[in-house]
Regions:
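N-terminal amphipathic/basic-hydrophobic helices that include classical n-h-c signal peptides
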Residues: 5-6, 127
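A metal-dependent hydrolase metal-coordination microenvironment
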Residues: 38-267
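Hydrophobic secretory-pathway targeting helix
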Residues: 7-38
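Glycine/proline-rich, flexible active-site/cofactor-binding loop segments
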Residues: 11, 15, 29, 248, ...
Length: 268
């Protein structure tokens, strides 16, 4: 869940304006201590707010200022974590590829995003600002360019992640086309070792001068294959092996909740 300091911070901000009411309720509790009652506080909040870190037009400061003027208690930001789609040519799909990319938090810098939210949260007393991102955990391709029916599926299935406040956690979100990660090396290492071994054999053959007209092209081929299959992928799922069901989404949910975040479906 969202870390306790955020909750305490929210209550602190709320009580600045409503402290007298809470004192009255406390007095009532003292008068009738045996009567158990729950105190519910209704707050006004907005979620999935985009800034100029991704597809929004306004800065975090401008949005916080607007929220405070309109007496909004909580703003949960939802900028796109990574807004990138790739299609590559097999067997070198991670090297020779076409990339379609839009502005995103990880493109502009997660550290700046978090720092700006925290700084403005300190400046605006009434409104609590909570960092959050909209994520695209998975998509997959069908068809081909040759047949003119190439289609990206599940691109519109998005999850909202609220409450992470670590730059490293944002950068290690299990998203396609994202940052290098050591999290999935154990799942991807076998292919890398096998291909890397074959590459080293071809290097040895070239060094010894065996059939260089054949072994040099083979060495270059396996050099590219080794690079293409490195084990430091940002996600264990790629878009070239069809629908993976709910696994990519559950993988992101498990990662985010392990970091103390809340996760919600945004688009399905």
């Amino acid at each position: 869940m969202i870390r306790l300091q955020s909750i305490f911070h929210s209550i602190k901000k709320f009580t600045l304006g409503y402290g007298s009411g809470l004192v009255l309720l406390g007095a009532l509790g003292a008068i009738a201590p045996s009567t158990a009652f729950a105190l519910y506080i209704q707050i006004d909040g907005v979620a999935d707010i985009k800034t100029n870190f991704s597809e929004g037009c306004s800065s975090i400061k401008d949005l916080a200022s607007q929220a405070e003027r309109q007496k909004i208690d909580v703003v949960l930001f939802g900028d796109l974590a990574r807004n990138s789609m790739e299609f590559g040519i097999k067997p070198f799909e991670r090297i020779f590829k076409n990339i379609t990319q839009g502005p995103s938090v990880l493109d502009r810098g997660a550290s700046g995003f978090i720092a700006e939210i925290k700084e403005n949260d300190r400046q605006f007393e009434r409104t609590l600002l909570i960092p959050g991102v909209e994520t695209i955990p998975f998509y997959f391709w069908s068809g081909s360019n040759y047949d003119k029916n190439l289609t990206a599926h599940n691109w519109d299935k998005h999850l909202l992640v609220f409450g992470m406040d670590s730059t490293e956690d944002f950068e290690q979100l299990p998203l396609p086309n994202s940052n290098f990660s050591k999290k999935y090396t154990h799942e991807l290492l076998n292919n890398f070792i096998i291909i890397g071994f074959i590459f080293m054999v071809t290097v040895g053959a070239v060094y010894k001068g065996y059939f260089r007209k054949f072994t040099v092209p083979l060495m270059l081929f396996f050099a590219l294959m080794t690079l293409n299959n490195h084990p430091f992928q940002s996600s264990p799922f790629d878009p070239y092996h069809g629908d993976q069901g709910m696994e990519p989404y559950q993988n992101l949910i498990d990662f985010a909740t392990s970091k103390g975040a809340l996760v919600f479906w945004n688009h399905m």
